């Protein structure tokens, strides 16, 4: 709840990053218990409140927010490539890490890349 013109931050876990890194990267889709949680055609993970956490795609978030009187200010991939190369990032020296951060901030709102992020931040202003 916020007043008119207030800013709302909503955080989400991304479907695609989980599919790539865990379901494929760790082979989890070969296990029946994980197969049962994933649509075999769309690869959309089941997102039921009974699950540990819910995974979202942008269309899910848009549908969820469509009923509220808000204007989107930013749709941001908060970790983008970082989770895919966590050890590499941890081992960067200060100079390379600074360049990496500049790269991250240059791409974190690109609509063609946000869906690959493990975590997404949606920022709205209440109308």
Task: Give the residues covered by each predicted segment.
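A structural signal for short, well-ordered beta-strand segments and their strand-loop junctions
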Residues: 9-12, 72-77
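A C-terminal cap/extension of S-adenosyl-L-methionine-dependent methyltransferases
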Residues: 74-127
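Conserved helix-to-beta-strand junction in the class I
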Residues: 1-4, 68
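Active-site rim elements
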Residues: 46-52, 108-111
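N-terminal accessory regions of S-adenosyl-L-methionine
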Residues: 34-38, 44, 90-93
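Ligand-binding pocket scaffold of soluble enzyme catalytic domains
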Residues: 1, 10, 116, 120
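Conserved class I S-adenosyl-L-methionine
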Residues: 4-39
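Short alpha-helix
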Residues: 49-75
């Amino acid at each position: 709840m916020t007043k008119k013109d207030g800013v709302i931050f909503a955080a989400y876990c991304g479907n695609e990053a989980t599919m790539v890194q865990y379901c494929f990267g760790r082979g989890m889709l070969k296990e029946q218990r994980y197969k049962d949680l994933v649509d075999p055609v769309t690869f959309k993970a089941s997102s039921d409140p009974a699950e540990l956490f819910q995974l979202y795609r942008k269309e899910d978030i848009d549908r969820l927010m469509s009923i509220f009187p808000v204007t989107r200010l930013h749709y941001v991939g908060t970790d983008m490539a970082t989770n895919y190369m966590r050890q590499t990032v941890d081992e960067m020296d200060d100079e390379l890490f600074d360049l990496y951060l500049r790269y991250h901030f240059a791409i974190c709102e690109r609509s063609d890349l946000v869906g690959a992020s493990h975590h997404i931040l949606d920022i709205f202003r209440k109308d």
